[in-house]
Amino acid sequence: MNNQSATMNTKDNPLGYKKESTLLVGFAIPCIISMLVTALYNIVDQIFIGQGIGMLGNAATNIAFPLSTTCTAISLLLGIGSATNFSLYLGAGEKNESEKYAGNGIVLMALFGIFLFLVTTIFLTPMLKFFGATNDVLPYAKAYTRITAFGFPFLIANTGMSKLILADGSPRYSMISMLAGAIVNTILDPLFIFVFNMGMTGAALATITGQIISFSISLRYKFHFKTIKLSRESFIVSAAHYKKIFILGASACFNQIAMTVVQIVMNNTLSHYGAQSIYGGDIPLACAGIITKVNMIFMSFVIGISQGTQPVIGFNYGAKKYARVGKTYLLALGAASALSLIAFACFQIFPRQIISIFGNGSDLYFKFSERYFRIYMFLTIVNGIQPVTSNFFNSIGKSQLGVFMSLTRQIIFLLPLIIIFPIFMGIDGVMYAGPIADAAAAIVCGYFTIRELKELKKLEINLTKC
């Protein structure tokens, strides 16, 4: 990368000189809203399905949820991978390369979306059974997923393109594209479920309608990039560009894949050990689904903050402004930790009230839900560390550490504990696996972060001497 062009570019681009806290707020808020919209597509369905269909409907959306996280994983792989490269080369003053990463990223989003739709349509029933569907839940899950699969290409493309739009310096446009679809989904859900009596099918139709509208708005931006101009050459397939997109998007993708794997294992564990308890198999599935969706709302804020740092950190690292890189990370970590404290208080004080939003149930249902909520989410207070740290390493081009950070909680700690603990503790083992994994992941991330911040300080000192 050309040092002279990078120095000149930082004078022209506000990412290189504007106050870090101002930039973080400007980029994080649209990212948070974007993440909230993604969460709301799931949680709004869950609320109206719970009120209109009941516990089996809630369990069905939980069974289908791994497919939603798979879509998110793919969109983050391609969206963050292309956007990170986009920012790094833009910061270095190489606009031609930025254009190629944007174009290649969009092509990949389209191809992966169509592929996932075809795979889901062909293997729907065995997939849902693999995800943990019981005989009672399966018909509801099939009715819902058969239709939402049509929206996968639009969901992947829209979520992925929103990262490029953000990296181009248009956080408000990214926010509007996501928000428009969520509003439509929220309006259509009660209309289709309650007025037209369409049940799970209605909820699914409302979801894909919102996704198509969001995609249409994002697609329009392809012709209106501010810092680059896409041409036919930008979309020409390049193995070298694909490879770097995959490398720098892997961290965020693996984090979502890890969530998917954990969700599948957890569903099967809950139904298996639940059947051996007083709760039965369906109550734990429904409760875990609700708690997962509620946690998504909290994590939308945390992940939104971490993603909001990506253009700032990526640009300044490419421009060798290391002090700004470290300061942006610490600001994001502080904001995420403050939100984690608020979430912890809500989860511990108001579990029954939160569960009640998603419909009624038996006393046994609420007893299990409250207990699960309080124990599993007990160390929410440290949950902001891992995603912010993972995104930090990814944004400075250290993808291997980013991937490792993204896997700490879900795969390295939580997954083994979910499998091992219930052998000795029954269904309670799933609950206690959560806080132990949270604590272990926070310690590991803290160690590597302190080491990296010291390295950034050394680089800044050496640069000043030169």
Which residues make up each language-model segment?
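Short alpha-helical transmembrane segments in multi-pass integral membrane proteins
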Residues: 1-28, 86-153, 195-250, 313-379, ...
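Residue-level signal for short hydrophobic patches within transmembrane helices
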Residues: 21-40, 44, 67-74, 150, ...
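Transmembrane helical elements of multi-pass membrane transporters/channels
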Residues: 26-45, 147, 158, 181, ...
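Hydrophobic/aromatic residues in alpha-helical transmembrane segments
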Residues: 29, 45, 82, 123-124, ...
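Helix-terminus/linker motif at the lipid-water interface of multi-pass membrane proteins
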Residues: 40-58, 128-135, 191-198, 260-290, ...
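Small-residue-rich hydrophobic transmembrane alpha-helices
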Residues: 58-118, 155-174, 267, 285-351, ...
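Hydrophobic transmembrane alpha-helices of multi-pass small-molecule transporters
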Residues: 70-73, 185-190, 215-219, 297, ...
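Short runs within selected transmembrane alpha-helices of multi-pass transporters and secretion channels
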Residues: 79, 148-166, 174-182, 203-216, ...
